[in-house]
C-alpha cells in the first residue's frame, strides 16, 4: 500500500515538474494573461462584497520607461543582473536585521516576486517556499533577465486592483508607462513594499524620502546604462 502511494506521489511530482517547465517556457514568449495574485485579489473582493475591476494592460519592454526599470532594481533588487534568483547576501543581512528586532525586513529578489505573484498563493508555509524556490530556479534558467523584469513590471500590483506599469502610470500620473519621468518612476518604485497602503501620486513623507533615496541609487548604479548589464553580467553559480 505504501509503495503504491509513493509511486503515485512520484507520478504527481513528475507531471507537475513537466507541466511547470512547459508553462514557464510558454510565458517566455507569451504574455501571461493573468497572475495568481490577480485571481486572489478578485476573489477577495467578491467575498468582501465589493467586487473590483482589475486594471492591467500588458506593454512590451520597449514601451516601458527605462527610468522605471532602473528605479525598480534600485529600490527592490540592486544585484538583479548578477544573481541567479537568490541574493544570499541580502538574505543574511535580513536575518541579522530581524534578529535585532524592530521592523521585519524581507530579502525577496525580483525573480522570487515574479514566481510568487505569477504562480503561487499568499501565505507563509514550507510548501509555498519550496514551490517559490522551484519556480524561481526555472525562470532564472529558462528566461533571460530582461524577460523576468518585463514580466515583473507588467504584473506587479501598484494600488488596489492596479497591476502593471501601464495601468499604474495612467492611474497615478495620467501618462503611459513609456512617458514616466524619472521622479514619477522613483515614486512608483518607492511604494512597492506596500502598494495598497502607500500611494505614488499622494506620497507620505516616508515615501517621498524613499523615492529620493531611490533616485540617488539610480545615479550610483549608472542610470540607463545599468540596463546593459541585464543579460551580460551574470556568471554561473559555480564560477568564482
Swiss-Prot record:
According to its record, how does it sit in the membrane?
Single-pass membrane protein
Gene Ontology annotations of biological process type = cell wall organization; peptidoglycan biosynthetic process; regulation of cell shape
Signal peptide feature range: none
- The superkingdom listed in its UniProt entry is Bacteria
Q: Which UniProt keywords apply?
A: Cell inner membrane, Cell membrane, Cell shape, Cell wall biogenesis/degradation, Glycosyltransferase, Membrane, Peptidoglycan synthesis, Transferase, Transmembrane, Transmembrane helix
Q: What does this protein do?
A: Peptidoglycan polymerase that catalyzes glycan chain elongation from lipid-linked precursors.
The answer to whether the entry has keyword Cytoplasm is no
Question: Which coarse location class applies to the principal site listed for this UniProt protein?
Answer: membrane
Q: Which Gene3D superfamilies does UniProt cross-reference here? A: Biosynthetic peptidoglycan transglycosylase-like
- Catalytic activity, reaction form: [GlcNAc-(1->4)-Mur2Ac(oyl-L-Ala-gamma-D-Glu-L-Lys-D-Ala-D-Ala)](n)-di-trans,octa-cis-undecaprenyl diphosphate + beta-D-GlcNAc-(1->4)-Mur2Ac(oyl-L-Ala-gamma-D-Glu-L-Lys-D-Ala-D-Ala)-di-trans,octa-cis-undecaprenyl diphosphate = [GlcNAc-(1->4)-Mur2Ac(oyl-L-Ala-gamma-D-Glu-L-Lys-D-Ala-D-Ala)](n+1)-di-trans,octa-cis-undecaprenyl diphosphate + di-trans,octa-cis-undecaprenyl diphosphate + H(+)
Q: Which GO terms describe its cellular component?
A: peptidoglycan-based cell wall; plasma membrane
In which pathway does this enzyme or protein participate? Answer: Cell wall biogenesis; peptidoglycan biosynthesis
Q: Which GO terms describe its molecular function?
A: pentosyltransferase activity; peptidoglycan glycosyltransferase activity
Q: Which residues cross the membrane?
A: 9-31
EC nos: 2.4.99.28
Keyword Protease assigned to the entry: answer is no
Q: Which family does it belong to?
A: Belongs to the glycosyltransferase 51 family.
Broad class of enzyme this protein falls into: transferase
> Where is it located?
Cell inner membrane
For this entry, the protein name equals: Biosynthetic peptidoglycan transglycosylase
Amino acid at each position: 500500500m505504501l509503495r503504491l502511494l509513493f509511486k503515485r506521489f512520484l507520478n504527481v511530482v513528475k507531471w507537475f515538474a513537466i507541466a511547470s517547465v512547459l508553462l514557464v517556457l510558454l510565458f517566455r514568449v507569451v504574455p501571461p494573461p493573468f497572475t495568481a495574485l490577480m485571481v486572489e485579489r478578485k476573489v477577495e473582493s467578491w467575498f468582501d462584497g465589493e467586487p473590483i475591476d482589475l486594471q492591467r494592460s500588458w506593454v512590451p519592454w520597449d514601451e516601458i520607461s527605462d527610468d522605471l526599470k532602473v528605479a525598480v532594481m534600485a529600490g527592490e533588487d540592486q544585484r538583479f543582473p548578477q544573481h541567479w534568483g537568490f541574493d544570499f547576501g541580502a538574505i543574511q543581512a535580513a536575518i541579522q536585521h530581524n534578529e535585532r528586532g524592530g521592523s521585519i525586513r524581507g530579502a525577496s529578489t525580483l525573480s522570487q516576486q515574479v514566481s510568487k505573484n505569477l504562480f503561487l498563493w499568499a501565505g507563509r508555509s514550507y510548501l509555498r517556499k519550496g514551490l517559490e524556490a522551484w519556480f524561481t530556479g526555472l525562470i532564472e534558467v529558462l528566461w533571460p533577465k530582461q524577460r523576468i523584469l518585463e514580466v515583473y513590471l507588467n504584473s506587479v500590483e501598484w494600488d488596489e486592483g492596479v497591476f502593471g506599469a501601464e495601468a499604474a502610470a495612467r492611474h497615478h500620473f495620467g501618462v503611459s508607462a513609456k512617458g514616466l519621468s524619472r521622479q514619477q518612476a522613483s515614486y512608483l518604485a518607492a511604494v512597492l513594499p506596500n502598494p495598497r497602503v502607500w500611494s505614488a501620486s499622494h506620497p507620505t513623507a516616508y515615501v517621498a524620502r524613499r523615492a529620493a533615496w531611490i533616485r540617488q541609487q539610480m545615479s550610483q548604479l549608472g542610470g540607463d546604462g545599468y540596463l546593459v548589464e541585464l543579460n551580460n553580467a551574470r556568471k554561473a553559480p559555480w564560477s568564482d
